[in-house]
């Protein structure tokens, strides 16, 4: 699988920005520069919705969307759509699809003047915005669609996110508008979809291995299985001679990937196999830096239980605690500080 060999922004001399700036459209590194060194896989993070968010936050589009969300007639149409597929939201249920009712309702939606105006304006903005081009291209990629489906399935099993997704399913446009204005929810959704965080490289990984282009490295099976949470595949790779501490071109080991993604079982398998918990990548980030920055609390606990150092600094002189603070991972900060003072 191809990897991004661009210069890692952690080496930048720029000063850190504020927390609010770190939530802007481009993820910030520990030194305040844009993240450019991506984990193996897609160079463009198809799950970073920040560009689309900026378009949807356009005052005129937001005003129209809010009007539609509050429009009783439009909400009635949304209810009709839900009734046309009555079992769609039930776990394990097969939809009882009423095609005629669905088509009739969609025709009414499309003839709603406000909806048509908003859709046309939004469509024009999306097509004309150069920053949205890679987003649209990525979602036409079958690998991205498969990865999206996989992440959505995980989100529906997440105890924190499941109630939110259920409410959006049940509440329609009004529920969507409610959560679109909630930065904490957007942050959780972004983390669940693998969006990058401040202080660390982009985490995006494609669901299937790509053919390595000339001059680019191919991702090892150990790295790939650890990234995707394939426990049995990882065990098989190690049993067949895979190197538990193999490094990619950026110096990252399988444990870096497993901890960055929160793949606890894979991290445990690697540690049981003797993987170094204090391995450093080319920017001196340890697996604990990754787990802390991405808020993977269980992986942080596992690493600490197995002797991971809390005080090691990366090239930007940031400890795992610093990276956790930079990304507002408060529960992780408490855990790390407790260990540091033992």
Curated annotation (Swiss-Prot):
A 1,2-diacyl-3-O-(beta-D-galactosyl)-sn-glycerol binds at residues 223, 246. Changing residue 113 to L: In akr2a-3; small plants with small and curled rosette leaves, as well as delayed flowering, especially in chilling temperature conditions. Ubiquitously expressed at basal level. Keywords: ANK repeat, Chaperone, Chloroplast, Cytoplasm, Lipid-binding, Membrane, Nucleus, Plastid, Plastid outer membrane, Repeat. It is found in: Cytoplasm; Nucleus; Plastid, Chloroplast outer membrane. A 1,2-diacyl-sn-glycero-3-phospho-(1'-sn-glycerol) binds at residues 294, 296. Residues 27-37 have a biased composition (Low complexity). It comes from the Eukaryota. Its main location: cytoplasm. Changing residue 150 to K: In akr2a-6; small plants with small and curled rosette leaves, as well as delayed flowering, especially in chilling temperature conditions. Reduced interaction with APX3. One of its GO terms (cellular component) is cytoplasm. Residues 12-26 have a biased composition (Basic and acidic residues). GO terms for molecular function: chloroplast targeting sequence binding; glycolipid binding. Disruption phenotype: Lethal chlorotic phenotype when homozygote. Reduced levels of chloroplast proteins, including outer envelope membrane (OEM) proteins. Defective chloroplast biogenesis. Reduced APX3 levels and reduced targeting of APX3 to peroxisomes. Compromised peroxisomal function leading to increased sensitivity to aminotriazole during seed germination and shorter hypocotyls in darkness in the absence of sucrose. ANK repeats lie at residues 217-246, 250-279, 283-312, 316-342. Gene3D superfamilies: 1.10.260.100, Ankyrin repeat-containing domain (1.25.40.20). Residues 1-41 are annotated as: Disordered. Pfam families: Ank_2, STI1-HOP_DP. InterPro entries: Ankyrin_rpt (IPR002110), Ankyrin_rpt-contain_sf (IPR036770), STI1/HOP_DP (IPR041243). Exhibits chaperone activity toward chloroplast outer envelope membrane, mitochondrion outer membrane, endoplasmic reticulum membrane and peroxisomal proteins, by recruiting specific proteins containing a single transmembrane associated with an AKR2A-binding sequence (ABS) and subsequently binding glycolipids (e.g. monogalactosyldiacylglycerol (MGDG) and phosphatidylglycerol (PG)) present in the membrane of the target organelle. The ankyrin repeats (ANK) mediate interactions with hexoses-containing lipids present in organellar membranes (e.g. chloroplast), such as monogalactosyldiacylglycerol (MGDG) and phosphatidylglycerol (PG). Interacts with TOM20-4, CYTB5-E, CBR1, APX3, APX5, TOC34 and GRF6. Binds to chloroplast outer envelope membrane (OEM) protein targeting signals, as well as to chloroplasts. Interacts with OEP7. Binds to HSP17.8 via its ankyrin repeats, this interaction enhances chaperone activity and chloroplast binding. Also interacts with HSP17.4A, HSP17.6A and HSP18.1. Binds specifically to two chloroplast glycolipids, monogalactosyldiacylglycerol (MGDG) and phosphatidylglycerol (PG). This is Ankyrin repeat domain-containing protein 2A.
